[in-house]
Curated annotation (Swiss-Prot):
Keyword GTP-binding tagged: no
InterPro entries cross-referenced by the UniProt entry: Alpha/beta_knot_MTases, tRNA_m1G_MeTrfase_C_sf, tRNA_m1G_MeTrfase_TrmD, tRNA_m1G_MTases_N, tRNA_MeTrfase_TRMD/TRM10
Organism from which the protein derives: Bifidobacterium longum (strain DJO10A)
Superkingdom classification of source: Bacteria
Listed Pfam families: tRNA_m1G_MT
Annotated localization: Cytoplasm
Residues the record lists as binding S-adenosyl-L-methionine: G137, I162, G163, D164, Y165, V166, L167
One example GO MF annotation: tRNA (guanine(37)-N1)-methyltransferase activity
Protein name: tRNA (guanine-N(1)-)-methyltransferase
Lineage, broadest ranks: Bacteria, Bacillati, Actinomycetota, Actinomycetes, Bifidobacteriales
Record key words, sorted: Cytoplasm, Methyltransferase, S-adenosyl-L-methionine, Transferase, tRNA processing
Function according to Swiss-Prot or TrEMBL: Specifically methylates guanosine-37 in various tRNAs.
Top-tier EC class: transferase
Region (Disordered): 82-105
Gene Ontology CC annotation, any one: cytosol
Length: 288
C-alpha cells in the first residue's frame, strides 16, 4: 500500500518508522511518505492560509496551495476542464462512488471534526486500498471547496471525524486512522489471529472481553477461575458472556444493532439476564 501524507509538520510522522509500522515498511508492505504543504507555495513567507471569507476568528487553509499539491500527488497533469462542475453536497459526506472495496485509484482522506465518525468498518474497507492520500488540516481547517472540487473530478474523497472533540490539527487524527487501517493488512501483524476477537471486529461486533496474564494472583486479586480450568469450551463461553456484558454496559448501541437470529441459545440467555428482550429482530432493553 502506498501512503502519502500532506502536512505543514511532516516531521510529525517520523514515528511511522517505529514498531510494526516500521517493520511493515522494511518488508515492503507499506510505502509511507510525508510531504510538506509549504513546498507548493510561491511567496517568500510560504503562506498556506488566509482570513475566512465573511469574517470570523482564525485562518483557513488556502485552496490554491492544496490544489497544486493534490494535483501532483494524484497525478493530475493540469486542472480539469470540469472545474465549474463542482459537487456542492455536504462536505461531511464520506461516501465513495463505490465504497465496497477501494483499490487502484487513490483515496483522498481529510480529518474533519464535523464529518462522520471513522469506524472499524471504515478501517477494514480502506485496508484493501492500493493508495491512500491524507490531507492534514490546521488552523480553522481547509477551504470547503477543496474536497468538493476533487469529488467533482471523480476522486474518492472521504472526510472523517475520530470523535466528538477538536484537535489543533489533523496529524493526530491521521495517525489514528493510519494505524487502524494498516494493522488490518495481511502480513502486518505477527499473529493474524490477534485481531479476530478484538473490539468492533466483524459482523455482530462487541467490545472485547478483558485480558489477564500471569501470575494467577496479583496483590490479592485472582484471575477468574474458569480461565485456569483448561476447558476451552468454558473459557470461550466465559469470554463471550463477558464481552456481551461489557458491551451492554458501555456500548448498548452495539447490542441493539445485533441480529437476534445470529445469537445462540447461550447468548440469548446472557442478554435476557442483563435485561434485554431478544425475541424481535434486534435486542431491546426492557427498561426502554
Amino acid at each position: 500500500m502506498k501512503i502519502d501524507i500532506v502536512s505543514v509538520f511532516p516531521e510529525y510522522f517520523e514515528v511511522m518508522n517505529l514498531s510494526l509500522m516500521g517493520k511493515a515498511q522494511a518488508k515492503g508492505l507499506l510505502e509511507i511518505k510525508a510531504h510538506n504543504l509549504r513546498d507548493w507555495t510561491h511567496d517568500v513567507h510560504h503562506s498556506v492560509d488566509d482570513t475566512p471569507v465573511g469574517g470570523g476568528a482564525g485562518m483557513v487553509m488556502k485552496p490554491e496551495v492544496w490544489s497544486e499539491c493534490l494535483d501532483e500527488l494524484l497525478g493530475f497533469s493540469q486542472p480539469s476542464a470540469a472545474t465549474d462542475a463542482v459537487d456542492t453536497s455536504d462536505p461531511g459526506d464520506s461516501a465513495a462512488p463505490d465504497s465496497s472495496a477501494p483499490s487502484g485509484a487513490p483515496v483522498l482522506i481529510f480529518p474533519n471534526p464535523s464529518a462522520p465518525l471513522f469506524t472499524q468498518r471504515d478501517a477494514t474497507e480502506l485496508s484493501h486500498a492500493d493508495h491512500l492520500l491524507f490531507g492534514c488540516g490546521r488552523y480553522e481547517g481547509y477551504d470547503a471547496r477543496i474536497p468538493d472540487y476533487y469529488r467533482a473530478q471523480g476522486v474518492d474523497v472521504r472526510e472523517y471525524s475520530i470523535g466528538d472533540y477538536v484537535l489543533n490539527g489533523g496529524e493526530v487524527a491521521v495517525s489514528v486512522m493510519l494505524e487502524a487501517i494498516t494493522r488490518l493488512m495481511p502480513g502486518f501483524m505477527g499473529n493474524p489471529d490477534s485481531i479476530v476477537e478484538e473490539s468492533y471486529t466483524g459482523e455482530g461486533a462487541l467490545l472485547e472481553h478483558r485480558q489477564y496474564t500471569k501470575p494467577a494472583v496479583w496483590r490479592g486479586i485472582a484471575v477468574p477461575d474458569v480461565l485456569l480450568s483448561g476447558d476451552h469450551g468454558k473459557v470461550d463461553r466465559f469470554r463471550r458472556d463477558e464481552a456481551l456484558a461489557r458491551t451492554a454496559e458501555i456500548r448498548p448501541d452495539l447490542i441493539a444493532a445485533l441480529d437476534c437470529k445470529a445469537l445462540d441459545k447461550a447468548d440469548r440467555k446472557t442478554l435476557m439476564a442483563l435485561g434485554w428482550e431478544v425475541s424481535a429482530a434486534h435486542p431491546r432493553r426492557l427498561a426502554d
